[in-house]
Each structure stands twice: as C-alpha cells, then as structure tokens.
Amino acid sequence: MAFNKLESSNNQEIISEEVGILKELLDDATRGIAGEQGLTTIQHLVELYDEGDYEALTQAISEMTNDDMVVASRYFSLLPLLINISEDVDLAYEVNRKNNIDESYLGKLSETFDVVAESDNARDILENVNVVPVLTAHPTQVQRKTMLELTNHIHELLRKHRDVKDGLINKDKWYADLRRYVEIMMKTDIIREKKLKVKNEITNVMEYYNSSLIKAITKLSHEFKRLAVEKGIELDNPTPITMGMWIGGDRDGNPFVTAETLKLSATLQSEVILNYYIEKVDNLYRSFSLSSRLTEVSETVAEMAKLSPDTSVYRENEPYRRAFSYIQSKLIQTLLFFKAGNFSNERAAKRLSENVRLGSVSTGEVVADFVHDRLSQSLQAVSQQTTEFYETAEAFHDDLLAIKNSLLENDDSVLISGDFEELLQAVEVFGFYLATIDMRQDSSVHEACVAELLKSANIVDNYSELTEVEKVAVLLKELQEDPRTLSSTNVSKSETLEKELAIFRTARLLKDYLGEEVIKQHIISHTESVSDMFELAILLKEVGLVDTERARVQIVPLFETIEDLENSNEIMKQYLGYDIVKRWIKNSNNYQEIMLGYSDSNKDGGYLSSGWTLYKAQNELTKIGEERGIKITFFHGRGGTVGRGGGPSYDAITSQPFGTIKDRIRLTEQGEVIGNKYGNKDAAYYNLEMLVSATLDRMVTRQITDPDELVDFREIMDSIVQDSNGIYRDLVFGNEHFYDYFFEASPIKEVSSLNIGSRPAARKTITDISGLRAIPWVFSWSQNRIMLPGWYGVGSAFNHYIEAEEGNLEKLQHMFETWPFFRSLLSNVDMVLSKSDMNIAFHYAQLAESEEVRSVFNIILDEWQLTKNVILAIEKHDDFLEESPSLKASLGFRLPYFNVLNYIQIELIKRLRNNNLTDDEISLIHITINGIATGLRNSG
C-alpha cells in the first residue's frame, strides 16, 4: 500500500512564521521579567551555540548567576514547547485539508479500506479488528496539568492563525490573546513541587478523555462503520478502537496502588463517561422539540415519556423531549450510584434514591457544572421523586435504540445523524466503564502470597522451596480438586497478602457492577515459569474470578528479559497444554494474550538483541497458538523512545512479523507520548486512525519478503545479534567503571527525585544497573544526549559482519530495501542518532570524578561514530533523516534552544554537587529536565 507521508507535507513556512511570532512574544515576556540585559544574555548563548563555540558557551553559562539561570532555564524550556504546539497545529490542519480534498496520507482509513475490501475475508477482518492503546502513568510525563491546559489554549489560537491571515478574524485581538497566554506560561510553575499521587495520575489522564479521546474515538468508530457500508460490507458491532488503562491497577513496584485506587480509577472513569452521556442527552432534549400533533412515536417512546419527571404543561405534546428527560434522569441516578461506590451493599441504589429525594445529595455534586447550569426542569425533578437507575449500559443503549426505531418508523430518520448517532456510537464503545483497567503485579509477590496461603491452610509449609514440577502439581490440585478458599482460615495474614486479596475482591465487585469489560486482564511481571501463572490463578480463585471452567480475568504473562523471551516458547507450550487452561481459553473466545516487554529486554541485551528476540518470540508463540487452534494476541509494552520499543507507530505495527497480528493488538502509550498523540482531538483522531490502518494493513498485506531470502536474513540476524548482545553487555555489565559513569555523567539522581509519577524509580535500593527501572534508565540517557539504549552495540556488530566477507554490505543493503522489519529497525537507529549529540555528551562526561570513569565516554564515542558510518552505509544515505525531511526540519528549529539547555543543566548539576544551590534552585535542574524532554518529544 503506497501512502504519502503526511509529515513531509507540513507547511514549514507557516510553522516558521508562527514560531517567529511565538518567539517574539516569549522574548517580550522574558524582557518583562529580566529586563533587556537578561534577554541579551539569552540571545548571546544561542549565538555561541550557533557558532559552534562550545567552550565559550560553557564559560558564559558558568559566569551566570543563579537568578540568571532561573530565567534562562524557563526560556529554553518553553520555546521548544511552543514550537511543538505550532507543529501539532500544522499536522491537524494537514489531516483535515487532505481529508476534505480526498488526498492520500500515511494511515488514511479510507485508503486502507480499499485494500481490505479486496480480501476474501474482509467482513471478518473488519468485524473483529480491535486496537487497544493502553494509557499508563509511567513517569516520563513531566508537565503539570496547568501547563497542558495553557498548551491547549495556545493550540486553539494557532489553529485560527490561517483565518487571521485571511482576514476572517481580528488580528489585534488574536495577537493579544496569544500574548496573554504566552505571558501566563512564562510566569507559571512548569513542574510539580509535590510528587504525584495515584489519584492525581488518574484525574490527569481523565482530562484527555474529556478534551479529545471520547470525541476522537466516537468519530473514528462512526467513520469505520460508514466506510464499511460504502464498501457494501455489513458489520454487526465492530470495535476498531477501545481503550485500556493501567493507572489504579498497575501495582508492580508501586506500593501506592491499592484496592481503593483500583475502585477510584473505575468509578472516576464511569463518572467521566456518564457526564458525557448526560451532556449529550441534554443536547438532544433541547433539540428534539417534535410535537405529537405533527409526528407519531412508538409505544415504547410514549411509555418513556409518561415516566418522565418532566411534567411541565409546555412539554406535554413533546414526547421525544420527555423521553430524553426520562433517560437523563436515569443517567443521573446511575452517576449518583457509581459516585457513592458502595457496590458491596445491594441497597446502595435505593438509599441513593432516598437521599436524592430528601435533598441530602444534590445533582450538582455529581453532574458536571457545564451540564448542571442548564439542566431542564426534568432534571430538577430528580430531587423530588425516585427514578430508576440503569443497571447496565445495555439497558441505556436499548432506550436509545427505542427512540431510533421510533424515528425510523415514522419517517424521521434524518434526525438520527449528529448528536444522536454520536451518542449511540459512544455507548457501544465505552459502556459505563470507559476503558478496561489492567491489573499488574510482579510474579514474586504472587508467589509469596500463595506460599503464605498454602502454609496457613496446612497444605504445604515450604512452597517456595519446591521444584517447578512440584509447584505446578500443588497448584493444579488446588485449582481442579479443592473448592474451598484458602484464605478462609483464621490465621492472621501478612500486610502484603491482605492488600492483594483486597484488590482482587474489589476487581470482582467492579466486574459484577460495571460489567466484564471493566477489568479483563491481569499481567504478571517477570513471568519465568508455568507456576507463575497458576499462582495468579490461585489468588483469583480466592475471590471467585477463576473456577475449573472459566477465568473471568485472563492471566497474561509478561516476558521481559532476553532469557525470558527465549524461554517463552516452552513456557507457553506447557501452560496451553493443561486441560483447565484449555477450558479457560475456550470460554474466552479462544484468545490468549501475551505481553512483550521492550524496555527490560533492551536494558538487558541492547537494542538489536531486544528487537530480534521479540521478533522471533512472536513468530514462535503465534505458531504454538495456531497448532492448538488458539489466537495468540500480543500486548506490546512499548515506551516513547526507541530504547523502549518506541518509534513511528505505523512503521512499528506494519513491520511486525507476518501473521502475528490476527485481529487484536494492544500497546502501551506512556508518559509524554500521551500528550503528544492525544493532547487535542485532531491529533488524537489522526494517531488512532494510523493505529487502526496500520493494523488492518498488516492483517491483509501478504508476505512481501521472499520466503527463501527470509531464511538467509534470519541466519544473518542471528549471528549479528549474538555479537551485538556481547558488545552491549561487555560495556553495561562488564565494564567496572560503567556504573559510576552512568550515575556521575547523567542526571539519573535528579531524574529519580523529579516529581513525575507516583512510582519509585526502582523496585528496591539500587546497587547495580539491573536494579534500576527501565524508564529512568532510558530517560537519563536521553537527557545527557547519548541515547545509548537506542543504538549501542549496533555499529560494531554490523561492522564485524561487513568485514567478514566481501559482499556482506550489499546483503545488508538488500535486507534494508526488501524487509520491513529490518528497515524499521535501522530507521529507528537513524532517528535516535540524529537526536544524540556527542559534543554535549562530552561535557556531561566531565562531571565524572575520575579519569578512569570519564574514559568510558571514549568507548561510547567510538561506537557511536562506527554506528553512524555503518547505518548510513546500509541505508545508502549521506546524512541522518533523509527519509524524514520534516523531522529533520523540526530538529533544526528546536535544537539550538534545547541544546543550550543541556549546557545549562550541566552547570546546574556542577553547582548542586558542590552544594552551591539552594533548595528552591535545585528545582531549576528539574525545569531543564522538562525542557529537554519537551524538545526531544520522546524521552522515556
């Protein structure tokens, strides 16, 4: 399928003009704070960088006072952010323009449908495809919610820029509004002073649903159905996009995630979507003023109208309005019920109705202000009489369908489009739960809990000391033969066990009240054996989520390290062979999900080793499923950076091994990537459209690499990757000075103290590299601009292969031209090298205390230069990013500013380590971290 890359169509002239305006406004704001001299100092730093006089730049920064640093840090942090906003606006403009004139672009859904429609099983593909972006709270999103809101205001103003140029909007007012928001931004705290709590993370993510995701997903789902109808393909209930959520359920290494946060996450999600429904129904109430004198309604709608709390004489002949009033009042009661969250008490709903009637609970406490301020008389009547609540989203959907059918039966079908159709679509996608919440915990915690349960029940005293075979035998016996719950004994339980059981009990209640979709998976971090999966089954059995026939929560192994990925084949062969597992999977529509860890496998073995091991594991696991009639689906635990599996989403999906995407795919969206992709409804629509198009494309596109050649390619990769793994591990785990280099020549300590998430930077005290979480590991290498996880070990391994035999370079060039996986693999290295800067990295190296530690940089520099030469040779390019001119231009805009910020950060770290910064001034380092992450756009 051939697409024009949308990025290459960006209007660089418009962006340059907007950046010029924004820079002018930022200069004015800076002048107001620091005076003309302060602005001159900042401009001088940029001039020195542009001239390449890095020593003079370093000297000039070293002479700045801490007060000067405050202004400079803010300036160089905010300008890349403003450039980002301009580029995002231009991207949205291009998407809309190309859609309106029916011009192709990368990931355009209508063109993907053209290809899918030619497939023999087009209907099955379109009916079953399901892409699930899973939003996580991984600590790489460093902006405050306030800054995100200011960003959105400026985004909206820049969207109007072209209208200003065309004279459709008053230029002076537009400019004044833009000035005001830039001024506010310059005087607003960029970073958080306090560490986030899980509740904050949940509410922050909910803002993306309110501002963009609900609208974008509803629009995309509707467009998906429309295109199917256009192609003459009848679909029942397709769900091309649904959302997932880790926040509130991911307790791996995060002690702050509890049963309460799980419940809070689910109830807040319900509140968000119910408020959306209430607003939509209120719009319909206002617009459906059809009179019974002029149109007829069905008996069902007439009955709803009779039950309406809206008894105004002025609306007695407006049955649709009264029906919508009835629906709206039920939605409010449902919202009251979920807000109370007392799911364990069957009388909760009745009490809530009583409380509302007696005035002890106001609708204003739960209904969004923008809705409550314009509630009709029918809603005010809710506080005066008891109204039913919706027990299920299906019941709500049925009421809407009754109105739709009434309109169809009475020749009013034209009224179905617009808000009504959007509402129906939203209910089908979001239900009352909005997004499926994943639970996740480390396998070692499960083992400790099960060992405690078995001991307290006098079954096994030393479970953890058993062999794997013995463990599986004990666990299977309990799962298949013993109906009792092990936790029912009177033996006191440890805090960990109590906490875990409380979470599982809450999950059971949430599923009972919100539906099966609210929690569908439990992921096991560090899965290393079959017993790891059966241990989770034991805990789920304790609360009735697993029995001998059915697992209401699917057990999902997460294979993370290189070794675990290599062993995943044998582990899953054994697991899928047990009869009880076969029954669980049969009752899950023959799906078994497996999560793949990109971050830890990369930290463990380097970029090439991680990418290739993941590729092979997917092939092998898919084959195992096919042999057993099971659809293996993959959950890709990708981060924002190449070092954590990131890179362009479209290329990442379309380069997956052929045949490994059946119809479902899940992938994590983490940290700053969430804001970049889903910060506004245009960006959200485009990025979701690309995910669906890429998935469909990979499902229908036949193998384009010659099968015989692919055998040779795999043999070549096996040898190169083995070499690369050794080179990487020799440095990271074999060099005696590497640990000190990382901690002294990067801002890892400062990153770990930054208030960017509720989760600690490590699962335990850090004594070596293996104990560090992958996210701060990658984040820190991004900050010092080495980007080591995204390329180290690549150059030497390829070079060894090239030098081994004449013609090997040509083989690699052929692989790059004909094998999508290999092309994507190397293109990502190209991109990450383009964002690295060895001049800056050299100055970070000088932060190391000894010459022996500093010498590690020379090893890294040699490998960087070799990698650059080899990658460009294989690509047949003269420079980085030759196939991504817009990204190259974008970096050209921003590099001078956030590169200067790196030099400022280095000086601040020096002052901190010499105890020359006050507590307030230490936050300046955090501001520079924010600015560099903003400039890079994918840092963790």
Swiss-Prot record:
- Under the GO molecular function aspect, what terms does this record hold? magnesium ion binding; phosphoenolpyruvate carboxylase activity
Q: Which residues form the active site?
A: H138, K603
- Protein purpose: Forms oxaloacetate, a four-carbon dicarboxylic acid source for the tricarboxylic acid cycle.
Any one of the GO CC terms: cytosol
Q: What is its EC number?
A: 4.1.1.31
Q: Which family does it belong to?
A: Belongs to the PEPCase type 1 family.
Q: Which co-factor is required?
A: Mg(2+)
NCBIfam families on file: PRK00009.1
Q: Which reaction does it catalyse?
A: oxaloacetate + phosphate = phosphoenolpyruvate + hydrogencarbonate
Write the protein's name.
Phosphoenolpyruvate carboxylase
The record's top EC class is lyase
Q: Name one GO biological process term.
A: oxaloacetate metabolic process
